[in-house]
Amino acid sequence: MAVNPLLTPTGQQTIPLIPSPFGPPTVDRDVLPSTVAPTDPRQFCVPSQFGSSVLPNTNMANVLSSRIYPGWGILPPESIKAVARRNEMIQRHHTARTEMEMYAIYQQRRMEKINPKGLAGLGIPFLYGSSVPAAPAAYHGRSMLPAGDLHFHRSTLRNLQGNPMLAATAPHFEESWGQRCRRLRKNTGNQKALDSDAESSKSQAEEKILGQTHAVPYEEDHYAKDPDIEAPSNQKSSETNEKPTTALANTCGELEPTHRKPWGSHTTTLKAKAWDDGKEEASEQIFATCDEKNGVCPPVPRPSLPGTHALVTIGGNLSLDEDIQKWTVDDVHSFIRSLPGCSDYAQVFKDHAIDGETLPLLTEEHLRGTMGLKLGPALKIQSQVSQHVGSMFYKKTLSFPIRQAFDQPADTSPLLDPNSWSDTMNIFCPQDTIIPKGIERGSMRN
């Protein structure tokens, strides 16, 4: 029979034993009732600061709930460093989520300030994708976009500006853009100018577009000094009207503004100087017979950019008008050999049997790792091929949106005003994609 250690044997003086302060208190099995005492002699000791010791038995639910505090268990306690690291990670997640929500609210307020209907009123297709209709009805009449649609990564805008394949592959971009712009212009009419913040951002956007314009200075001055293209008296500023119009026209292949000076039946020759020596001159017919019904000429391909002179004529058998996918291995060899600084690697392309179908698929890793090219020639070849492919897609998709571009009469409002977009924005430029001013401001601030 077990003896209580707190009691002495019969006949001796009872002296209570003081438990050690350094060890956990224990409870004898005979002190507890039979319903509580477990069959296993092992005991589960709890330090005194968490209550008296109890035993792990299935019949002790009430005892455990009143004696043991949350967080106490049989597992070893977690280290302080791990707890601090976990708390810091959770705090970072909460902070990042809060910043994203605040930025979304800020973007919404700014879009509402520029356009009361929000971006859904503009109906920009690439915000939602080709599968979702670009209309406010898609969101059941809500006047603003969800918070997730306001986060545009900067690389997305760069790809839209620099890679024409993203927007040229789907004709839905040109169709819905032109229809929504014309509808927006009819509904809004003559609206008041925006506040000073919007005007300052407009001037910044004008300077950026003018800086990117690859125009001949003489033609730009000629458009500015022509008395027939004076801004109407009801416009707020002639400078705000003239410069963006000229910049957009010159950027999109030296195309004159459709709403300022109707063209007659004539042809014009543009002379482009070669980039390397400045002596060669290649003349192109850029305007054909104009449409006498509405006095508008169809737009023409842009002149070659600096550095693309090798794409104009290569050995007399390759030109910009030819499809790059039809090139043979010898054509690719001639193309690489004609590029300045890349003639030494032309034989490498021929040894690897690179033709017109595989040339656009080459990446920098292929050129440098597999074919052994240096960084400069590899980047130059990639740039020339991308410009060639972009001009090819541009010419293929040019004829389709132009028929809708001139269905409506032209407007005399500024091109950069989001309340009255001009029809000339239907003309798709591969290198200079026009985007709304609100998104442009967001990308410039980022």
Curated annotation (Swiss-Prot):
Which InterPro entries does the record match to this protein? PcG_chromatin_remod_factors, SAM, SAM/pointed_sf
The terms describing its cellular component in GO are:
cytoplasm; nucleus; PRC1 complex
State the source organism's domain of life. Eukaryota
Annotated region (Disordered) at: 187-207, 225-277
Keyword annotations from UniProtKB, A to Z = Cytoplasm, Nucleus
Compartment(s): Nucleus; Cytoplasm
User: Can the keyword Cytoplasm be found in this entry's annotation?
Assistant: yes
Is Cytoplasm set as a keyword in this record?
yes
CDD domains reported for this sequence: SAM_Samd7_11
Instruction: Show where the SAM domain sits.
Output: 327-392
User: What is a single Pfam family found in this protein's UniProt entry?
Assistant: SAM_1
Q: List the residue ranges of the region (Required for localization to nuclear polycomb bodies).
A: 94-168
Give this protein's Gene Ontology molecular function annotations.
chromatin binding; DNA-binding transcription repressor activity, RNA polymerase II-specific; histone binding
Q: How would you summarize where this protein is expressed among tissues?
A: Expressed in the retina (at protein level). Expressed in the retinal inner and outer nuclear layers.
Q: Which GO terms describe its biological process?
A: negative regulation of DNA-templated transcription; negative regulation of gene expression, epigenetic; retinal rod cell development
List, as start-end ranges, the regions of compositional bias called Polar residues.
Answer: 232-249
Q: What is known of its domains?
A: The SAM domain mediates its oligomerization and localization to nuclear polycomb bodies.
Subunit details: Monomer, homodimer and homooligomer. Component of a Polycomb group (PcG) multiprotein PRC1-like complex. Interacts with PHC2, NR2E3 and SAMD11. Interacts with RNF1 in a PHC2-dependent manner.
Disease in which the protein is involved: Macular dystrophy with or without cone dysfunction: A form of macular dystrophy, a retinal disease in which various forms of deposits, pigmentary changes, and atrophic lesions are observed in the macula lutea. MDCD is a progressive, autosomal recessive form characterized by reduced visual acuity and macular atrophy involving the fovea. Some patients also exhibit mild generalized cone dysfunction.
What does this chain do?
Component of a Polycomb group (PcG) multiprotein PRC1-like complex, essential for establishing rod photoreceptor cell identity and function by silencing nonrod gene expression in developing rod photoreceptor cells. Via its association with the PRC1-like complex, promotes epigenetic repressive marks H3K27me3 and H2AK119ub marks in nonrod genes, silencing their transcription. Represses Crx-controlled photoreceptor-specific gene expression.
Q: What is this protein called?
A: Sterile alpha motif domain-containing protein 7
Lineage of the native species?
Eukaryota, Metazoa, Chordata, Craniata, Vertebrata
